[in-house]
Amino acid sequence: MQTLPKERRY
């Protein structure tokens, strides 16, 4: 399963 770069919210 490919891990997609998730949007980091600060």
Curated annotation (Swiss-Prot):
This is Ribulose bisphosphate carboxylase small subunit. GO terms for cellular component: carboxysome. Heterohexadecamer of 8 large and 8 small subunits. RuBisCO catalyzes two reactions: the carboxylation of D-ribulose 1,5-bisphosphate, the primary event in carbon dioxide fixation, as well as the oxidative fragmentation of the pentose substrate in the photorespiration process. Both reactions occur simultaneously and in competition at the same active site. Although the small subunit is not catalytic it is essential for maximal activity. The basic functional RuBisCO is composed of a large chain homodimer in a 'head-to-tail' conformation. In form I RuBisCO this homodimer is arranged in a barrel-like tetramer with the small subunits forming a tetrameric 'cap' on each end of the 'barrel'. GO terms for biological process: photorespiration; reductive pentose-phosphate cycle. Keywords: Bacterial microcompartment, Calvin cycle, Carbon dioxide fixation, Carboxysome, Photorespiration, Photosynthesis. It is found in: Carboxysome. It comes from the Bacteria. Belongs to the RuBisCO small chain family.
